Every structure is written in C-alpha cells, then in structure tokens.
Amino acid sequence: MASSKPQNLQSDTKAELPVLIIGAGLAGLTVALHMAETQPVIVMAKRGLGEAATAWAQGGIVGVVDKEHDSVDSHVSDTLDAGAGLVVESTARYIAEESAEAIRWLVEQGVPFTADEAGPMGLHLTREGGHSQRRIAHVADATGKAIHEVLLDKARAHKNIQLLEHWIALDLITNRQLDAKTQRTKPNRCYGVYALDIKNNRVETIEAKSVVLATGGVGKVYRYTSNPDTATGDGIAMAWRAGCRVGNMEFIQFHPTCLYHPSDRTFLITEAMRGEGGLLKLPNGTRFMSEHDERNELAPRDIVARAIDFEMKKHGLDYVHLDATHLGEAFIKEHFPMIYARCMSLGLDITKEPIPVVPAAHYTCGGVVTDLKGKTDLSGLYAVGEATYTGLHGANRLASNSLLECIVIGKAAAADISSLKTPVMPNLPLWDESQVEDADEQVVIAHNWDELRSLMWNYVGIVRTNRRLERALHRIKLLRYEVQEYYANFKVTRDLIELRNLLECAELIVRSALMRRESRGLHYSRDYPGTWAVSYPTILTPQAEGTSENPET
C-alpha cells in the first residue's frame, strides 16, 4: 500500500506499532514480505521506490541447484577463496545451504528467470568470476531490476505494508539519547527514528517495534562508482552514531568493468560477460590477464580490478577494452540485451567493437556488525544487506553472493522480529528546529561533497599508501567539522543528511585501512605488500574510538 505519510507516527495503540524498514531494495522488501502476514510494516525509501541499488544489479543470484555438477561445499570453497582468508566459514555455509530455497522463493514470487528446459529447476545458469561452476540464476542481464519489480509489486499490493517515498532517516532514537543518566545503568535500545519528509520539508518522529536498516552501501563516497545516488552509507552512519560496531570497512570492492563514456560514467558491464567468454585487452588488442592470474578473466574481482588499474597506469591509458565480439551477435543480444541496448544508444555496437571499461567503486564488503538473524549491538535494531558485516564476504565479495545474502538474512531477520513482543515505549520527543534557520548557501554542501569524493578516489582507492590515507583522514576530519557546524545551524536537507553520513563512513573506511598493516583482498597497500599467514576482521567500536581484533595491528 503506497502512502506519502506514516499512518502511525506516534500511536497511542502501542500493540500495533509497526516494524520500520529503512530501504526499499531487495533486503528491505524481503524482510517486509516475510513479516507482513503477522504485523504492520512501513518501508521507507529516500527517493522513488524504483531507485534502489538492487535494480542496478545485472549478473544474477547464486543458487546451488545443480546437484549433479555443483554442491554447497563447492560454493563455500569459492566464497572462502574469493574472501582471501577473512570469510567466516559458518556464515558462508549457512547462506550456501539456503541458496536453493532462496531461488525457489523468488520463483514463487514470480521472478521470470531466464529458462533452460534442460537445466536444474528449468533455469539457465551462468558462471561469473571466482565461481568454479555454473550456479548463477539470472534474468538476462537485468536480474536485479526484474527481482525488484516483482517484489515491489507484491509489497504494493499487500494490505499490511505501507510504502513511503521521499523520506530519509536522520538518526535512530535510543533511550540513551532520551536520558543521558541511564547511559551506564540501562541497556541501550532503539525505539524509532527521526525522518525528513522531503516533499513537505518537515522532520517527523516515527515510533517502531523494531527498526531494520536496509540502506545499502557507501559507493557514492567515491568519484567513480557503479552505484545509484542512494548509496550514501546512511544505515552504517546512523548505527555507528547510535553505538553499534562496524566491521571490515576498509574492503571496498571496485567492479573491474564499468563503461568508460563521457555520457555515462556509472553503467556497469556485468561480470557474466567475462564468465561467458569476454576478453580483456589493451587498446592495441593485446590480452593481459594471464600476466596477473592463472584464471585470466575469471579471476576474482579484486585481482581483475588491480590488473586493469596496473595496466592503465603502466601504459598511460584512460581505459582498457572488454571484447565480446567473438561471442556472436545473436548470443550477445540474447544474453546481454540491456548492455547491448545501452551501448547502442551511445553509438557503440558491442557485437562489432570492444567496450571501453574502467574500474569503479561497486560494493561495500563491510558494515554494521550483525549475527545471522540481522541483529545488531542495539536492541530493537536490525540490519540486512550491503549495510552489514556478517562475515560472508571477507576481504572480497564473490560475484552474485550479495543478492543471496539479502534474501537469506532478510528471511531470518523477519522471523526473529516476528517473535518479539512490542516494547514498552517511552515518550519520544519531537524534532526541535527552533534554534536553526534555512540554509543560506547550498554551495557549501556541493563543494564539500565534490572534495570528499575526489580525495577518496585519489587517496583511498584501489592501491593505497599510509601517507595518502593519513592525508585523507586529516581532510575528512576538517570536512566533518564544517558539515557538523552547518548541521547544527541550519535546517536539514537530503543533501546535507547524505553528506554527513558519507563523511562518517569515509572516516570509518580510512581508519580501518590504516589499521590493516598488510595487503589482503580488496585492500592493497604499497607500504605493506605482504599478506599475513593469519589475519582477523577489523572491528571498530564507537566507545573505544576503534579497535581491531588483530593482535598485529
């Protein structure tokens, strides 16, 4: 049921308090659809409902459904290998074991997966980098869009689901915020959020039985990214400010192949194109991946992204080529129709000429620390999807594991929340804007946003050094001070909220990177090129201003 305003902002009927889900992508919709049969749910989107990052996912979703050629053990092994020693094996196994059921659930919802009558479950399975078997269910090359449209239609039709567009959460409301005296004597709990109704320019106080963060990653902290404008790390930043730990924030995955074109700098060229035989070449036609990894184009993303970055810098290139012309026109149009159409609209016929590609920030492998039910350190607060650290991705995410994680953990979170009793709610104060005024110059926000994204790209990118990281941290702290001062004196806007969150996440990324004195997975340091025999996740704790479980850091 679509709506422009929550039906229960502060209700006298506490037994009917809704569950508030912040984010309307696959993670949020999975939780909502699994819970809505038993209780009311609000799903909040800060832009239009169709603008979630899920809709941008091309490749597919992992499913161990081919029992003849594939197995859970094989999927787990591939996940462990890609994750470079930091994957929690029990997490990887749990999610792999649930993968077939996740695919079945999507089929039951009506997702029109590309079919193959001879394939397991009647599905055409493709293969992507890092996978030893064909196990990727897909909808041509627009899997995320198809899944998102189906689930969004289901949510729109459900009487117990209220969908909000153009609402953005500012901060979580916890009992420690309500009464500072209880901070040391009473466990902290989340009771709701302050959220900006963007269309009406008004901040509301929203009570909730539980809050679920399904806000996605932080790709917009970088100048070049495959992510939509929604990827500003809102959930990670809010959870951190509320007292939750975050893990492995240094591991930002750069997708190896985003289209290089002046008119379209965020269009991703799916991993599946290399999985089906696409070749990486220098502009002179020379292949180069064999010099970097024996798996060539099928190496994990971190290796391929670094290889492309190395070759671009070595030869002074703006891009390299991804050549799929040898696959044939019919094959390309059947398996990659969206990529073909987008490139044709830009004057590039990929059946006859190679695609110019560059790496771009793509996926946040760390985030809010949760268990396998999505529970965070804060009672009443859950997190699901790219905003989280569950241990699945380790130091590098295996292709197409992300959509799977959203469904498996989302389903588990829904079950756990459904078992909870509605808490005794305190009186939540209204948002106070009596001491602030309308912003005088938006150029401050625009300038600081541009500066942040540039310094993160130049100093905290694919290859890092301590000097670059320290410069970045120094500048980020200055920007945070400026933005916090602005936040305290002027009325909030979406751009201000997002910039505040991006700066919070940028500092977490840099601090985590400085703590990792080795090169592993997505984190490559020229100062520490070696890899330890044993390593641990980087866990930052708000109260301790950052700690690591690694005794060598």
Residue spans of the language-model regions?
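Glycine- and aromatic-enriched mobile tails/lids
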Residues: 2-9, 14-18, 34, 40, ...
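Short hydrophobic core segments
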Residues: 20-22, 206-215
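Short beta-strand to alpha-helix junction loop
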Residues: 87-100, 135-153, 164, 225-233, ...
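Conserved redox-cofactor binding core of oxidoreductases
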Residues: 107-202, 214, 258-261
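An anion/pyrophosphate-binding glycine-rich loop and adjacent beta-alpha core
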Residues: 238, 244-355, 416-423
